[in-house]
Design a protein with these regions (language model features):
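Extracytoplasmic metal-acquisition and chelation regions
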Residues: 18-352
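Bacterial N-terminal signal peptides
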Residues: 3-15
Protein backbone atom coordinates (compact mmCIF):
# COMPACT_ATOMS: atom_id res chain seq x y z
CA UNK A 1 0.00 0.00 0.00
CA UNK A 2 2.90 2.38 0.85
CA UNK A 3 4.53 1.74 -2.56
CA UNK A 4 1.25 2.39 -4.36
CA UNK A 5 0.72 5.65 -2.48
CA UNK A 6 4.29 6.79 -3.26
CA UNK A 7 3.77 6.01 -6.93
CA UNK A 8 0.50 7.94 -7.06
CA UNK A 9 2.12 10.96 -5.41
CA UNK A 10 5.00 10.82 -7.89
CA UNK A 11 2.53 10.80 -10.76
CA UNK A 12 0.66 13.72 -9.15
CA UNK A 13 -2.50 11.61 -8.79
CA UNK A 14 -4.57 12.80 -5.81
CA UNK A 15 -4.85 10.24 -3.03
CA UNK A 16 -8.27 10.10 -1.39
CA UNK A 17 -9.52 8.08 1.51
CA UNK A 18 -12.36 5.62 0.88
CA UNK A 19 -15.79 7.20 1.31
CA UNK A 20 -17.17 7.08 4.82
CA UNK A 21 -20.67 5.65 4.89
CA UNK A 22 -23.22 7.10 7.24
CA UNK A 23 -24.13 4.62 9.95
CA UNK A 24 -27.30 2.67 9.24
CA UNK A 25 -30.01 3.51 11.72
CA UNK A 26 -30.84 0.70 14.10
CA UNK A 27 -33.82 -1.28 12.93
CA UNK A 28 -36.81 -1.49 15.24
CA UNK A 29 -36.99 -4.93 16.85
CA UNK A 30 -40.57 -6.18 16.92
CA UNK A 31 -41.62 -9.37 18.68
CA UNK A 32 -45.16 -10.73 18.38
CA UNK A 33 -46.92 -13.48 20.26
CA UNK A 34 -48.56 -14.84 17.09
CA UNK A 35 -47.28 -15.13 13.54
CA UNK A 36 -50.30 -13.32 12.08
CA UNK A 37 -49.50 -10.25 14.16
CA UNK A 38 -45.94 -10.65 12.91
CA UNK A 39 -47.10 -10.72 9.29
CA UNK A 40 -49.08 -7.51 9.77
CA UNK A 41 -46.17 -5.85 11.59
CA UNK A 42 -43.82 -6.86 8.79
CA UNK A 43 -46.04 -5.09 6.27
CA UNK A 44 -45.76 -1.90 8.33
CA UNK A 45 -42.08 -1.82 9.31
CA UNK A 46 -40.75 -2.70 5.85
CA UNK A 47 -36.96 -2.56 5.77
CA UNK A 48 -36.77 -0.46 8.93
CA UNK A 49 -37.63 -3.24 11.33
CA UNK A 50 -36.97 -6.87 12.20
CA UNK A 51 -39.98 -8.97 13.19
CA UNK A 52 -39.90 -12.22 15.18
CA UNK A 53 -42.79 -14.30 16.50
CA UNK A 54 -42.93 -16.59 19.51
CA UNK A 55 -45.67 -19.07 18.61
CA UNK A 56 -45.42 -20.97 15.35
CA UNK A 57 -48.20 -20.78 12.79
CA UNK A 58 -49.40 -24.33 13.37
CA UNK A 59 -49.29 -24.11 17.17
CA UNK A 60 -52.32 -23.74 19.41
CA UNK A 61 -51.86 -20.21 20.83
CA UNK A 62 -53.52 -21.22 24.09
CA UNK A 63 -50.80 -23.73 24.94
CA UNK A 64 -47.45 -22.46 23.74
CA UNK A 65 -44.52 -23.96 25.65
CA UNK A 66 -42.09 -21.09 26.40
CA UNK A 67 -38.47 -21.73 25.45
CA UNK A 68 -35.40 -20.16 27.12
CA UNK A 69 -34.58 -18.44 23.82
CA UNK A 70 -37.77 -16.40 24.07
CA UNK A 71 -36.44 -14.50 27.10
CA UNK A 72 -33.51 -12.70 25.40
CA UNK A 73 -35.71 -12.16 22.34
CA UNK A 74 -38.15 -10.16 24.45
CA UNK A 75 -35.33 -8.64 26.46
CA UNK A 76 -33.99 -6.93 23.33
CA UNK A 77 -37.37 -6.01 21.81
CA UNK A 78 -38.46 -2.45 21.13
CA UNK A 79 -42.08 -3.46 20.47
CA UNK A 80 -44.09 -6.45 21.67
CA UNK A 81 -47.47 -7.24 20.12
CA UNK A 82 -49.85 -9.60 21.88
CA UNK A 83 -53.62 -10.00 21.86
CA UNK A 84 -53.86 -8.41 25.29
CA UNK A 85 -56.72 -10.59 26.52
CA UNK A 86 -56.51 -14.08 28.03
CA UNK A 87 -55.48 -16.06 24.95
CA UNK A 88 -51.70 -16.14 25.52
CA UNK A 89 -51.64 -16.89 29.23
CA UNK A 90 -47.97 -17.82 28.87
CA UNK A 91 -46.99 -14.23 28.01
CA UNK A 92 -46.86 -12.60 31.50
CA UNK A 93 -44.26 -15.08 32.79
CA UNK A 94 -42.09 -14.46 29.74
CA UNK A 95 -42.31 -10.70 30.16
CA UNK A 96 -41.35 -11.03 33.82
CA UNK A 97 -38.26 -13.05 32.94
CA UNK A 98 -37.29 -10.73 30.09
CA UNK A 99 -37.40 -7.75 32.47
CA UNK A 100 -37.67 -5.23 29.64
CA UNK A 101 -39.67 -2.20 30.84
CA UNK A 102 -40.08 -1.00 27.26
CA UNK A 103 -42.37 -3.91 26.32
CA UNK A 104 -44.13 -4.74 29.57
CA UNK A 105 -47.78 -3.72 29.85
CA UNK A 106 -47.87 0.06 30.12
CA UNK A 107 -44.48 0.45 28.46
CA UNK A 108 -44.09 2.44 25.23
CA UNK A 109 -43.45 -0.67 23.15
CA UNK A 110 -46.29 -2.80 24.52
CA UNK A 111 -49.11 -3.23 21.98
CA UNK A 112 -52.43 -4.85 22.89
CA UNK A 113 -53.79 -5.97 19.53
CA UNK A 114 -57.40 -6.04 20.75
CA UNK A 115 -57.57 -2.30 21.56
CA UNK A 116 -60.46 -0.65 19.72
CA UNK A 117 -62.03 -3.93 18.59
CA UNK A 118 -65.65 -4.76 19.39
CA UNK A 119 -65.23 -8.06 21.25
CA UNK A 120 -67.68 -10.91 20.82
CA UNK A 121 -68.78 -13.55 23.35
CA UNK A 122 -68.20 -11.39 26.42
CA UNK A 123 -69.60 -13.55 29.25
CA UNK A 124 -72.20 -12.17 31.62
CA UNK A 125 -71.24 -14.71 34.27
CA UNK A 126 -68.43 -17.15 34.84
CA UNK A 127 -68.02 -20.60 36.36
CA UNK A 128 -65.53 -23.43 35.89
CA UNK A 129 -68.28 -25.60 34.41
CA UNK A 130 -68.06 -23.42 31.30
CA UNK A 131 -64.54 -24.67 30.56
CA UNK A 132 -61.63 -22.36 29.71
CA UNK A 133 -63.95 -19.45 29.14
CA UNK A 134 -62.38 -16.20 27.98
CA UNK A 135 -63.53 -13.74 30.61
CA UNK A 136 -62.95 -10.64 28.44
CA UNK A 137 -64.51 -12.02 25.25
CA UNK A 138 -63.43 -14.06 22.25
CA UNK A 139 -59.70 -13.41 21.66
CA UNK A 140 -59.43 -14.84 18.12
CA UNK A 141 -59.70 -11.34 16.76
CA UNK A 142 -57.53 -11.67 13.63
CA UNK A 143 -60.08 -13.81 11.75
CA UNK A 144 -61.87 -10.66 10.54
CA UNK A 145 -60.17 -8.43 7.93
CA UNK A 146 -61.60 -5.29 9.50
CA UNK A 147 -60.13 -6.36 12.82
CA UNK A 148 -56.81 -6.77 11.01
CA UNK A 149 -57.06 -3.09 10.06
CA UNK A 150 -57.47 -2.12 13.71
CA UNK A 151 -54.61 -4.42 14.72
CA UNK A 152 -52.40 -2.67 12.16
CA UNK A 153 -53.38 0.72 13.59
CA UNK A 154 -52.49 -0.46 17.09
CA UNK A 155 -49.10 -1.71 15.90
CA UNK A 156 -48.50 1.63 14.19
CA UNK A 157 -49.21 3.46 17.45
CA UNK A 158 -46.58 1.39 19.25
CA UNK A 159 -44.04 1.87 16.48
CA UNK A 160 -44.51 5.64 16.56
CA UNK A 161 -43.89 5.70 20.30
CA UNK A 162 -40.58 3.88 20.14
CA UNK A 163 -39.35 5.19 16.78
CA UNK A 164 -40.79 8.67 16.16
CA UNK A 165 -38.13 9.40 13.53
CA UNK A 166 -39.73 6.71 11.34
CA UNK A 167 -43.32 7.72 12.06
CA UNK A 168 -44.14 9.00 8.57
CA UNK A 169 -42.62 5.94 6.91
CA UNK A 170 -44.56 3.55 9.13
CA UNK A 171 -47.78 5.55 8.74
CA UNK A 172 -47.61 5.40 4.95
CA UNK A 173 -47.01 1.66 4.98
CA UNK A 174 -49.86 1.11 7.43
CA UNK A 175 -52.17 3.12 5.18
CA UNK A 176 -51.06 0.98 2.23
CA UNK A 177 -51.93 -2.12 4.26
CA UNK A 178 -55.40 -0.75 5.03
CA UNK A 179 -56.00 0.10 1.38
CA UNK A 180 -55.01 -3.40 0.34
CA UNK A 181 -57.34 -4.92 2.93
CA UNK A 182 -60.26 -2.82 1.69
CA UNK A 183 -59.62 -3.78 -1.92
CA UNK A 184 -59.20 -7.45 -1.01
CA UNK A 185 -62.41 -7.45 1.06
CA UNK A 186 -64.75 -5.30 -1.06
CA UNK A 187 -63.13 -5.37 -4.48
CA UNK A 188 -61.26 -2.58 -6.24
CA UNK A 189 -64.25 -1.23 -8.17
CA UNK A 190 -66.50 -0.72 -5.15
CA UNK A 191 -63.67 0.87 -3.18
CA UNK A 192 -63.10 3.37 -5.99
CA UNK A 193 -66.80 4.26 -6.01
CA UNK A 194 -67.41 4.61 -2.27
CA UNK A 195 -63.97 4.50 -0.52
CA UNK A 196 -62.70 1.77 1.75
CA UNK A 197 -63.42 3.54 5.07
CA UNK A 198 -67.05 4.22 4.04
CA UNK A 199 -67.60 0.57 3.16
CA UNK A 200 -65.85 -0.53 6.35
CA UNK A 201 -68.14 1.67 8.47
CA UNK A 202 -71.23 0.20 6.81
CA UNK A 203 -69.85 -3.29 7.29
CA UNK A 204 -69.09 -2.79 10.98
CA UNK A 205 -72.64 -1.53 11.51
CA UNK A 206 -74.10 -4.58 9.75
CA UNK A 207 -75.65 -2.35 7.08
CA UNK A 208 -73.41 -3.07 4.10
CA UNK A 209 -75.49 -5.61 2.21
CA UNK A 210 -78.78 -3.76 2.69
CA UNK A 211 -77.07 -0.63 1.41
CA UNK A 212 -75.60 -2.37 -1.63
CA UNK A 213 -78.91 -4.03 -2.47
CA UNK A 214 -81.02 -0.88 -2.24
CA UNK A 215 -78.65 1.72 -3.70
CA UNK A 216 -78.10 1.84 -7.43
CA UNK A 217 -75.33 3.00 -9.72
CA UNK A 218 -75.83 3.37 -13.45
CA UNK A 219 -79.20 1.65 -13.23
CA UNK A 220 -78.05 -1.44 -11.33
CA UNK A 221 -77.72 -2.31 -7.63
CA UNK A 222 -74.35 -1.51 -6.11
CA UNK A 223 -74.23 -5.15 -5.04
CA UNK A 224 -73.29 -5.96 -8.63
CA UNK A 225 -70.05 -4.03 -8.07
CA UNK A 226 -69.03 -6.03 -5.01
CA UNK A 227 -65.79 -7.94 -5.40
CA UNK A 228 -63.02 -9.37 -3.28
CA UNK A 229 -63.42 -11.84 -0.45
CA UNK A 230 -67.03 -10.88 0.19
CA UNK A 231 -67.99 -11.73 -3.37
CA UNK A 232 -66.06 -14.99 -3.23
CA UNK A 233 -67.94 -15.86 -0.03
CA UNK A 234 -71.39 -15.12 -1.49
CA UNK A 235 -72.08 -18.76 -2.52
CA UNK A 236 -71.85 -19.91 1.10
CA UNK A 237 -73.15 -16.78 2.82
CA UNK A 238 -75.78 -17.72 5.40
CA UNK A 239 -74.92 -21.42 5.29
CA UNK A 240 -74.18 -23.01 8.67
CA UNK A 241 -71.05 -25.02 9.43
CA UNK A 242 -69.83 -27.12 12.32
CA UNK A 243 -66.56 -26.09 13.95
CA UNK A 244 -64.06 -27.76 16.23
CA UNK A 245 -63.39 -24.83 18.56
CA UNK A 246 -65.06 -21.47 19.15
CA UNK A 247 -62.43 -19.49 17.25
CA UNK A 248 -64.23 -18.45 14.07
CA UNK A 249 -66.78 -16.00 15.49
CA UNK A 250 -65.30 -12.85 13.94
CA UNK A 251 -64.91 -14.62 10.61
CA UNK A 252 -68.49 -15.88 10.91
CA UNK A 253 -69.80 -12.39 11.57
CA UNK A 254 -67.93 -10.92 8.59
CA UNK A 255 -68.97 -13.54 6.06
CA UNK A 256 -72.25 -14.70 7.66
CA UNK A 257 -71.10 -18.30 8.08
CA UNK A 258 -72.52 -19.34 11.46
CA UNK A 259 -70.92 -22.14 13.48
CA UNK A 260 -73.91 -24.04 14.84
CA UNK A 261 -72.15 -27.02 16.43
CA UNK A 262 -68.78 -27.52 18.12
CA UNK A 263 -66.85 -30.78 18.44
CA UNK A 264 -65.18 -29.31 21.51
CA UNK A 265 -68.15 -29.02 23.91
CA UNK A 266 -66.67 -26.13 25.87
CA UNK A 267 -63.41 -24.22 25.37
CA UNK A 268 -60.45 -26.30 26.48
CA UNK A 269 -62.51 -29.39 27.34
CA UNK A 270 -61.70 -32.43 25.16
CA UNK A 271 -64.78 -33.96 23.55
CA UNK A 272 -66.08 -37.22 24.98
CA UNK A 273 -67.26 -40.03 22.68
CA UNK A 274 -70.80 -39.28 23.78
CA UNK A 275 -70.54 -35.62 22.84
CA UNK A 276 -68.99 -36.44 19.47
CA UNK A 277 -71.90 -38.79 18.77
CA UNK A 278 -74.34 -35.99 19.64
CA UNK A 279 -72.59 -33.67 17.19
CA UNK A 280 -72.69 -36.33 14.48
CA UNK A 281 -76.43 -36.78 14.97
CA UNK A 282 -77.06 -33.02 15.01
CA UNK A 283 -75.03 -32.50 11.85
CA UNK A 284 -77.01 -35.22 10.10
CA UNK A 285 -80.32 -33.76 11.26
CA UNK A 286 -79.39 -30.21 10.22
CA UNK A 287 -77.70 -31.37 7.00
CA UNK A 288 -74.48 -29.56 7.85
CA UNK A 289 -72.24 -29.74 4.78
CA UNK A 290 -68.93 -28.46 6.15
CA UNK A 291 -66.81 -29.08 9.25
CA UNK A 292 -64.26 -26.30 9.85
CA UNK A 293 -61.18 -26.84 12.00
CA UNK A 294 -57.70 -25.46 12.45
CA UNK A 295 -54.82 -27.80 11.79
CA UNK A 296 -53.56 -28.09 15.37
CA UNK A 297 -56.60 -30.05 16.55
CA UNK A 298 -57.05 -33.81 16.29
CA UNK A 299 -57.10 -34.37 12.54
CA UNK A 300 -58.27 -37.97 12.83
CA UNK A 301 -61.24 -36.95 14.93
CA UNK A 302 -62.20 -34.20 12.49
CA UNK A 303 -61.98 -36.57 9.53
CA UNK A 304 -63.97 -39.24 11.38
CA UNK A 305 -66.83 -36.84 12.11
CA UNK A 306 -66.80 -35.60 8.53
CA UNK A 307 -66.87 -39.14 7.18
CA UNK A 308 -69.76 -40.21 9.41
CA UNK A 309 -71.85 -37.16 8.54
CA UNK A 310 -71.00 -36.81 4.87
CA UNK A 311 -69.66 -33.31 5.53
CA UNK A 312 -66.49 -32.00 3.93
CA UNK A 313 -63.64 -31.30 6.32
CA UNK A 314 -61.92 -27.95 5.91
CA UNK A 315 -58.70 -28.13 7.93
CA UNK A 316 -56.72 -24.90 7.70
CA UNK A 317 -54.06 -23.05 9.69
CA UNK A 318 -55.24 -20.49 12.19
CA UNK A 319 -52.21 -18.28 11.63
CA UNK A 320 -49.69 -17.36 8.96
CA UNK A 321 -46.87 -19.82 8.61
CA UNK A 322 -49.19 -22.64 9.60
CA UNK A 323 -49.02 -24.18 6.12
CA UNK A 324 -46.64 -23.93 3.19
CA UNK A 325 -46.97 -20.68 1.25
CA UNK A 326 -49.16 -18.94 3.84
CA UNK A 327 -46.86 -16.04 4.68
CA UNK A 328 -49.07 -12.93 4.72
CA UNK A 329 -52.46 -12.02 6.09
CA UNK A 330 -53.75 -11.99 2.53
CA UNK A 331 -52.47 -15.53 1.96
CA UNK A 332 -54.28 -16.67 5.10
CA UNK A 333 -57.64 -15.11 4.26
CA UNK A 334 -57.40 -16.26 0.63
CA UNK A 335 -56.90 -19.81 1.88
CA UNK A 336 -59.83 -19.73 4.30
CA UNK A 337 -62.21 -18.33 1.69
CA UNK A 338 -61.08 -20.56 -1.16
CA UNK A 339 -61.23 -23.74 0.93
CA UNK A 340 -64.73 -22.98 2.18
CA UNK A 341 -65.87 -22.10 -1.33
CA UNK A 342 -64.45 -25.38 -2.58
CA UNK A 343 -66.11 -27.34 0.22
CA UNK A 344 -69.51 -25.82 -0.50
CA UNK A 345 -69.01 -26.30 -4.24
CA UNK A 346 -68.34 -29.39 -6.30
CA UNK A 347 -64.68 -29.93 -5.41
CA UNK A 348 -63.26 -31.43 -2.25
CA UNK A 349 -61.58 -29.13 0.23
CA UNK A 350 -57.87 -29.48 0.75
CA UNK A 351 -56.62 -30.08 4.28
CA UNK A 352 -53.61 -27.95 5.14
Amino acid sequence: MLRLTTLLVALHVPVTAPPVRAPVADKVKVVTSLTTYGAIARDIVGDRGIVSSIATGDENPHYVQPKPSFVPLLGQADVFVTTGLDLELWVPALLDKANNPKVTEGGPGYVAAYAGIDLLDVPTSYSRSQGDIHVYGNPHIWTSPLNAVQIARNILTGLKRVSPENADYFAQREKDFEDRIYQALFGEELVKLLSGPTLADLDRQGKLFDFLKTKQYQGAPLLNRLGGWLKEAMPFRGKPVACYHKEWDYFSREYDVPCVDYIEPKPGIPPTPGHVLEIINEMRTQHIQVLLSTNYYDRNQVMEVAQKTGAKAVIVPSNTGGAAGINTYFDLMNLWISELARAFGTGAATAN
